[in-house]
Amino acid sequence: MAVTSLRRKLLLCAALGLLLVPGCHTVPQALPYAEAVRTPPEDVAGMRARTVTVEADHSVTSYRYPELGGAHPLTVRVRTLMARRQTDFLEDLPERGRPELHQDVSVLAASSQVVGVRLTAATEAGMSRDLTADTLWYDADSGEVLPWTALFRDDEAIERAHLALARVLRDGYNLPAQQLPGVVGEAARDQAALDEPAPSPSASPRGRPTQAPGRTEFSDPDRVREAAERWTDSPLRDAAFSTAGGLAVRMDPAQVPGAGMVREVMVPIEAADAEDLLSELGYRAREAALSGNDPGDDLVPDGDSDTPGHTLDCSQLKCVALTFDDGPGEHTDDLLDILAGYDAHATFYVLGSLVEEFPEPVERMAAEGHELGNHTWKHDDLARMPGNAIKKDIGRTNEAVRELTGTTPPTVRPPYGSLNGTVRRSVDQPLVLWDVDTLDWQSRDPEAISEHALTHTAPGSVVLFHDIHRTSVDAIPQVLAGLHRQGYHFVTVTDIFGGQGLEPGEVRTDARLT
């Protein structure tokens, strides 16, 4: 296989004593250094990147994530992790200042078999700066998104990688054993202890995971994830493949005395040392990293999808579905402008008769990632209608939306929330009501509307507004600001019920997590 030929090339270059880069050119370095293979997602064929930024009075948040189709497991995992980190950040804001959280992604490898990404989170608060990073690997064979441990054969291979880092830090940076940081230092000290007569042959070295007898490989995704839990503090969490075919491990300069005033220290594990540490996925990932990153058509499904809202797992997040009934109308465009400021995706339960009257806002809703629901043709009470009339009314509205947007409304909201058995049997879509009624049609008071929404919303709530009222639209900036400050993410009705497989005629009011 190709791994064998790569191995020969790498070992040849290593034998020549060269710092390996493509073509085996020599690059003089004062200190041991590895050039990591990291590529912006937009530079990878077939992959796009989407950036979400919200600038509020109390904070600035942004994140960029890769899009490999609307529901690709890696897209969902990356965006959900970033959204969760944003929620944690917002829930822990100080009383003063305007801290910032900026999350980004780069591609470590991409082929039809595997995609690896690096996620970074940079926080700024006053004079304080912090950067954390993690890596994820998508295995196309299993369809699983796995942590960094998937690159290694087993726990022993991870320990040997730590020892390789210890040698570089000790020999290249002149770090004495007692200054070797974290688990790298523990591994080196444990190895030194094993090289001396031990008081008990059965004793397990401090800080090292205990291997089960005969266990030689991370044989399934659960074991890979368990290993990541055991090695939470390992610098290998932020490892990439180097241009030399080995590993490039990012370490905090504060942990490496003598590194100088640099942003990051990239410690190399040479190709020859890494060769026997990698898992089968690791070999495939290395080949992808060194071969130019082409994920292929099979790995980028639905590449033309423009529905970024379908990439959040709301079962793990604080999500809320803002819904707007009875439109579109003369205020709908203003509402869409307001929603865009928070990258908020909403659901509009439209009247078929108004779809024909206000086609431009409807087209804009679809283009900007919002969802259109069916609210009947002209707001008749479905519970007072026979089954054939219900079918005709809903079908007519579906067709009006489909003609403008190319999609059929996935859900129906009966006017007044009025329904009965005939309605449930006659409608071929799920029926979605609400759990938070802002009573905006009654109060016509922006302050009262926003206060009600902010105090009654819970994770999984479906909140009812009406975009035909100016006062309702005027309340939305405060609603968005307040819920964003609480760490919420604004999604469509379909997103908030994601993965639950709602049935035709099924009635739901919310997707509350508690």
Task: Label each region the model flagged.
Residues 297-381, 385, 389-390, 400, ...:
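Active-site beta->alpha N-cap acidic-glycine motif
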Residues 334, 356-357, 380-510:
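Catalytic domains of cell-wall/extracellular-matrix polysaccharide-remodeling enzymes
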Residues 120-122, 141-143, 254, 327, ...:
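Solvent-exposed coil/turn segments that connect beta secondary-structure elements
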Residues 116-120, 137, 321, 347, ...:
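Soluble periplasmic/extracytoplasmic beta-strand elements of cell-envelope proteins
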Residues 83, 87, 91, 140-143, ...:
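Sec-exported extracytoplasmic/periplasmic mature domains
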Residues 124-125, 147-152, 321-323, 327, ...:
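Second-shell loop/turn segments in exported
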Residues 109-110, 129-131, 241, 314-316, ...:
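Extracellular/periplasmic catalytic domains that process cell-envelope and extracellular macromolecules
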Residues 2-314, 320:
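Compositionally biased intrinsically disordered regions enriched in Thr/Gly
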